[in-house]
UniProtKB/Swiss-Prot annotation:
This is Dol-P-Glc:Glc(2)Man(9)GlcNAc(2)-PP-Dol alpha-1,2-glucosyltransferase. The lineage of its organism: Eukaryota, Metazoa, Chordata, Craniata, Vertebrata. GO terms for biological process: dolichol-linked oligosaccharide biosynthetic process; protein N-linked glycosylation. Residues 28-64, 119-130, 173-175, 271-283, 345-367, 414-436 are extracellular. It is an enzyme of class 2 (transferase). The keyword Glycosyltransferase applies. One of its GO terms (cellular component) is endoplasmic reticulum membrane. Its EC number is 2.4.1.256. It is found in: Endoplasmic reticulum membrane. Keywords: Endoplasmic reticulum, Glycosyltransferase, Membrane, Transferase, Transmembrane, Transmembrane helix.
Amino acid sequence: MAQLEGYYFSAALSCTFLVSCLLFSAFSRALREPYMDEIFHLPQAQRYCEGHFSLSQWDPMITTLPGLYLVSIGVIKPAIWIFGWSEHVVCSIGMLRFVNLLFSVGNFYLLYLLFCKVQPRNKAASSIQRVLSTLTLAVFPTLYFFNFLYYTEAGSMFFTLFAYLMCLYGNHKTSAFLGFCGFMFRQTNIIWAVFCAGNVIAQKLTEAWKTELQKKEDRLPPIKGPFAEFRKILQFLLAYSMSFKNLSMLLLLTWPYILLGFLFCAFVVVNGGIVIGDRSSHEACLHFPQLFYFFSFTLFFSFPHLLSPSKIKTFLSLVWKRRILFFVVTLVSVFLVWKFTYAHKYLLADNRHYTFYVWKRVFQRYETVKYLLVPAYIFAGWSIADSLKSKSIFWNLMFFICLFTVIVPQKLLEFRYFILPYVIYRLNIPLPPTSRLICELSCYAVVNFITFFIFLNKTFQWPNSQDIQRFMW
């Protein structure tokens, strides 16, 4: 880290942590009792804090593994010995929530290290761009909000980013172990451990593909036609996978992830599924429109990079040149929206989430809207893919497979499910110009201000309950 860049980084981290501490104080004053999912997480963590680890003490409404509680106890328990605090203080709601604030500091540092690793250091990428990119992602609204509640998001992000960083540095055993830690926070994080393995495979495939293209006499026969490149890559993959040398090399590199995969399969067999506890509200289904919702979500939060007159012009030009393909894609998308759109009971009933109002006032009110939005979905998907064109075709393939696997089976539309894939995506696009980063950061700041203000000040009550309710992501 260059000296000047070190100053930028330290200033950004210090200011972010200071603001976070002030917000944490405001949250602590406003929320004296557990809120939303905290009514399950906090009592369970407190039981662990008291030393009650038996299964009979487990809340069956909790559907994730106890990673958050175990790490929390490991962090706050030493305070009893170091500071002489009582167990009541150490296991309080405020202390447990503070663990996520510590995770947010770790996430800030990991994001910076990942930007330095993923984005090569060159004259085109200045130190201010890396620090601004880090700051922007650290205050990404849907992630930043949950730093102040006792949810699994911050810890899940920490271990997944750490696993990705270790993978990029070639420490695959450490990466797989951290992937297991991430899995202990949220079971679907196993997909991002697979992504780390896929990253290794994509790197080796890219190297072999470049070698193939550089040969004077291509071993593959010339192919002509509209899908020539696709068929050529498919032929290459088939030839590559037939080589024992190639497969053994990949096996030696990825065996820690393969072992983790076997452990996950064993867990699923023994548990009878991926979800623990109450499964009635977490049934898997083929919810293909989740991809479209993610594309829209990404377009909204990355609009300085994905939405511009030149982008729209390029897209329209491409549509005209390949209008038959566009027509087919549109037809398939409309069919997927028609046959595979689901509305989870929580989405329809819980008016504390923003998704409730998006669904009720847009999709539920106007039946045709979900079809009229298909061209916008296609543009968003194309713009996302276009922004990743600096990555290899094999990396893109691995990323979109993992994206599909992690969000399509989810019946419930909830923005929290989009956080990790969004951050992975945002890390891997080329560093934008400083002006766009400032625009993005400013928009995030405005969104954060609005959501925090609404959450803390615009409360309401249900007719059948005296509890204070709040609007949130």
